[in-house]
Amino acid sequence: VLGAAGLAVLIAAPGRLYRLGGLAAWALGIVLLAVYLAPHGHRPLLAGAAVLGVVLAVAGAAVLKRWPWLLPLVTLACVPARIHVTVGSTEANLLVPMYGVVAAAAFLLAWELWRGDPRMRELGIAAWPLAAFAAWVGLSILWTGDLRQGAIDLLFFYLPFGLLAVALARLPWDRLWALALLVELTALALVFAAIGLYQYETRDIFWNPKVEIGNAYAPFYRVNSVFWDPSIYGRFLVVAILACLVVVLFERDRRLLIGATVAIAAIWVGLYFSYSQSSFAALVAGVIL
């Protein structure tokens, strides 16, 4: 509840000091949730890892301060990077690199607010609805039937990605950097699609034994590329296809138009072999909208 309330204040509060307080509450909420979820008997090890993480995050914040546009570029590159973590009897596939980026962004945001940065409500008209949603998510943990799962959702999804949204919104977006991000997104999607086609041809699935077992009994063969789950892989490709489709529909530069069209065709082939119904539904919805 504390972390979600802090995130809500950070998103919508009108003053710098209020936002600093919200950021502090967000950070404290993160720590308390991590302590609650940490396996007993391994907390000293996790505390040591946390200290190392803080040092690396501070260094990352210094890098982002010098080159702020690394934030969206590195964030996008970290999307598929799930690290298999085992602590005692607890196993999980976590977005560890992404959480490192979020921590660096949090330290940079704290520094900027401390130094008197007057910006507020960077998310514009979405600030109040998102703040209300964050607060509601935090409150809902008070009556959830599964407290542990609620804590996991807050710690690994809502709290870090809420702050990341604020950090990204603070950047002075322009056409050049949007194009750079599109190029990175398209290049990653093409590489991932090629890896997916390799998996289909060789029948070699990475990371996830559940997909291998499912393929053994299914009439089709699903691939996951470098992602843990075929559906997550498919959704990443859908985002790339829709971004390229915007270029096809609205860009007048012939080279960009041809390149985007070819990319859509190649990425779609990779998407097909994910056999992800949710991804195809998202693609249809995105094209219609």
Give the ranges of each region predicted by the language model:
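Transmembrane signal-anchor hairpin modules in multi-pass inner-membrane enzymes, especially those
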Residues: 1-139, 149, 173-186, 248-258
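Juxtamembrane transmembrane-helix termini
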Residues: 167-169, 173
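Alpha-helical transmembrane segments of multi-pass inner-membrane proteins
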Residues: 1-10, 19-34, 56-59, 103-106, ...
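Alpha-helix C-capping/helix-to-loop hinge sites
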Residues: 87-88, 142-145, 169, 269
